[in-house]
Amino acid sequence: MVRVMATGVFDILHPGHVLFLREARKLGDELVVVVARDSTVERLKHKPIMNEDIRRFMVESLKPVDRAVLGHKDDMYKTVEDVRPDIIVLGYDQKFDEKEIEEECRKRGIKVKVVRLKKYGDSDLNGTRKIIFKIVDRVDDLYAKDRNS
């Protein structure tokens, strides 16, 4: 059985996330998704809109996903040690170096192949920031009726 591991924030689920997870699932028999902890997201990106438990629940509810787990708070490789994947899948925009991941895993006794997926689609809803900006741009239109009531 080939176990695939994918990782991400998954703050506001969008079509890009679904496509990423579908493609990751095709690479093996089981897909385990690691959802970044709130503290990790705040340190590396921004304060998440959805908390880690909600994000994990949402991801685990997706059809391609067999299991979703929260990442380790201090050491991402501890999660890799727990999951023991055969393949780690990276999205086109994830800022990790494939060779560095493979080397660190090798040092920890884990033989893993790291695969970076290509960009898929170019929808204006294929990114959390794009969705947030679209909502902000349209908030007046969306709630104008409520304000006038």
UniProtKB/Swiss-Prot annotation:
The keyword DNA repair does not apply. It catalyses: FMN + ATP + H(+) = FAD + diphosphate. Keywords: ATP-binding, FAD, Flavoprotein, FMN, Nucleotide-binding, Nucleotidyltransferase, Transferase. Pathway: Cofactor biosynthesis; FAD biosynthesis; FAD from FMN: step 1/1. One of its GO terms (molecular function) is ATP binding. Its cofactor is a divalent metal cation. InterPro entries: Archaeal_FAD_synthase, Cyt_trans-like, FAD_synth_RibL, Rossmann-like_a/b/a_fold. Its EC number is 2.7.7.2. ATP binds at residues 9-10, 14-17, 93, 120. The keyword Ribonucleoprotein does not apply. GO terms for biological process: FAD biosynthetic process; FMN metabolic process. Pfam families: CTP_transf_like. Homodimer. Belongs to the archaeal FAD synthase family. Catalyzes the transfer of the AMP portion of ATP to flavin mononucleotide (FMN) to produce flavin adenine dinucleotide (FAD) coenzyme. NCBIfam families: cyt_tran_rel. This is FAD synthase. It comes from Aciduliprofundum boonei (strain DSM 19572 / T469).
